[in-house]
Design a protein with these regions (language model features):
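Intrinsically disordered, low-complexity linkers and stems that provide flexible hinges
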Residues: 28-30, 87, 137-204
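Surface-exposed, acidic/Ser/Thr-rich flexible loop segments
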Residues: 48, 52, 99-170
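Solvent-exposed beta-hairpin/edge-strand motifs
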Residues: 53-93, 145-169
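Sec-dependent N-terminal signal peptides
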Residues: 3-13
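Short amphipathic beta-strand and strand-loop transition segments with alternating hydrophobic
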Residues: 26-33, 84-99, 110-115, 171
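Extracellular adhesion/glycan-binding regions together with long Ser/Thr-
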Residues: 92-114, 175-191
Length: 204
């Protein structure tokens, strides 16, 4: 009986760890009005490195992150103190095996306490990016281009817009608010280069 309980406990831990890891596989984008060149991003990840006292969301070159970025500790529900740091400052922490560009930008969230041995912390990053080169409207048509690196990627068009073309296979549906949502699955080891185009829906 004791062995059975131990086995069940180990199975539960394994399933929980797998579930947490699975959630690292997806990212969600919500396109705002193309005249703003802005879109929102949300993604989760788990931090396991013993002694790590902060987490980072790295901003791609060419994008500008809004100051209202939030990082939430999903295990406690609390918002972390966030601030913008340079790649040089991140590299000095020694948390990541591959150094980032010293001139790059990241949003840093400070954990309430460093990661303890055999513990982990799950966080959610929510940000608004501005990318005039990658998201714009021309002649009444919006264009959004981006490389997607996660296995599962969701992109939602602004309210009132319909999809006219997409260069990569996607599952297309409507969300609860009637907005067009695209689901991209990437089973390769490299990134998907996505180009989405859309137009405003004509009113009857």
């Amino acid at each position: 009986m004791k062995r059975a309980l131990i086995a069940l406990a180990l199975l539960a831990i394994a399933q929980q760890s797998f579930h947490r890891a699975e959630q690292d596989r997806e990212i969600r984008y919500w396109l705002l009005d193309p005249s703003t060149h802005q879109f929102r991003i949300s993604h989760d990840f788990t931090v396991t490195r013993v002694g790590q006292a902060s987490v980072h969301s790295f901003v791609r070159k060419g994008s500008v992150v809004a100051p209202d970025a939030t990082i939430i500790d999903l295990d406690t529900g609390k918002k972390l103190h966030t601030h913008v740091v340079t790649g040089k400052e991140v590299n000095a922490l020694g948390y990541y095996p591959t150094p980032v560009d010293a001139d790059s930008i990241a949003v840093q969230g400070d954990l309430e306490e460093p990661i303890a041995k055999d513990h982990s912390t799950r966080v959610r990053v929510e940000e608004t990016y501005t990318d005039a080169a990658g998201y714009f409207e021309k002649d009444g048509e919006l264009t959004w281009t981006r490389t997607l690196g996660r296995p599962l990627n969701y992109v939602t068009l602004p309210a009132g817009w319909m999809l006219t073309s997409v260069n990569t296979p996607a599952t297309i549906s409507l969300d609860d608010e009637g907005r067009v949502k695209l689901r991209f699955v990437n089973i390769r080891n490299d990134e998907l280069s996505i180009t989405i185009k859309g137009r405003r829906r004509t009113r009857p």
